[in-house]
Structures are given as structure tokens and as C-alpha cells.
């Protein structure tokens, strides 16, 4: 089972996309010599806006936010679940210290610490989205090509993409 995304306008009606049209669209995009797209049952479909949202701060009194309650990123950068796990990795010891030891230090720093990673990953997801999803604006299209060329031809560009894509250290 796999999840695929086809770029369509946000106001697209799902009724306009039959299973055959979806498979044809994917086959066009995956038209590679020596490889054939394996079709199957489409179990779900939706129009997903490529949007970002960050709630700052990620704490209000005794309420701590983590994961999708605190931030939304487009799937292009593959960061949503990673961010949620990183949030919980910070929040769990903070809550243990707060509840068991009455030590507020980690809890008080949770939001600021988590937001450093959240903003970095939100920017990366935005960057990947603008680099990989076409724009009808000629100026934006040239910026996109410039970015793609830089990532494909520059060691620094490739390293930056790889570091952000593979994940930042937990303490970032």
C-alpha cells in the first residue's frame, strides 16, 4: 500500500477524478523505462491544501500542545510525524520532572525548545513544496528551476536538503 499525491487546484471536485483518471495521472508521472506502476484499489482520496500552521507558544498554562495540535506542515517535506515524535520526546521528560519532582525547568522551556525545530521543519516543508510543485507564474517557475538546479548541482545544496530531509538532532 502506498500514498501518492497528485497536484491539482485546491477547488478541484473529487467527482472529477475517477479511479481511471487517477491511475492515468500517476502513470504519466511515473513513466520510467523498465518500471511499471502497479495499480490496485484506491481506498481514499481527498484534496489536500498544501498549507502550514504553527501555534506559538505551544503551551498555555497547564495545556501543552504537541503534533498536529501545535503545527501542520504539507506532506512534501515528510516532517509531520517526525515533528510529533520530537515534540513528545521533549514533552514526556518535562512532564515527568514536573509531576514527580515538582521541577518546572523542562516544562517551562518546552515551547521554545520545540518551536526551534518546528520553525526549521516548517520552512523546509515550505521550501520543498515550492521547489517541487509547479506554479503558473513565470517568475515563480524560474525561481523553482533555479532552486532545483542548485540542489542537483551543488554539494552544499544537496547536503542542506539531505540534512533537513533526514532529520535534525533532537536538541536542535
Regions inferred by a protein language model and the residue ranges of each:
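Short, conserved glycine- and acidic-residue-centered signature motifs
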Residues: 59, 81-84
Amino acid at each position: 500500500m502506498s500514498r501518492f499525491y497528485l497536484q491539482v487546484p485546491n477547488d478541484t471536485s473529487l467527482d472529477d477524478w475517477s479511479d481511471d483518471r487517477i491511475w492515468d495521472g500517476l502513470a504519466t508521472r511515473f513513466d520510467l523505462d523498465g518500471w511499471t506502476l502497479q495499480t490496485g484499489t484506491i481506498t481514499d482520496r481527498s484534496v489536500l491544501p498544501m498549507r502550514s500552521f504553527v501555534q506559538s507558544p505551544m503551551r498555555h498554562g497547564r495545556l501543552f500542545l504537541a503534533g498536529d495540535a501545535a503545527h501542520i506542515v504539507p506532506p512534501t517535506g515528510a516532517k509531520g510525524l517526525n515533528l510529533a515524535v520530537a515534540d513528545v520526546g521533549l514533552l514526556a521528560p518535562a512532564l515527568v520532572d514536573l509531576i514527580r519532582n515538582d521541577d518546572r525547568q523542562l516544562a517551562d522551556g518546552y515551547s521554545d525548545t520545540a518551536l526551534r525545530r518546528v520553525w526549521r521543519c516548517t520552512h523546509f516543508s515550505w521550501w520543498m513544496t515550492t521547489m517541487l510543485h509547479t506554479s503558473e507564474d513565470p517568475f515563480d517557475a524560474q525561481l523553482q528551476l533555479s532552486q532545483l538546479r542548485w540542489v542537483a548541482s551543488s554539494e552544499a545544496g544537496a547536503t542542506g536538503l539531505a540534512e533537513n530531509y533526514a532529520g535534525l538532532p533532537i536538541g536542535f
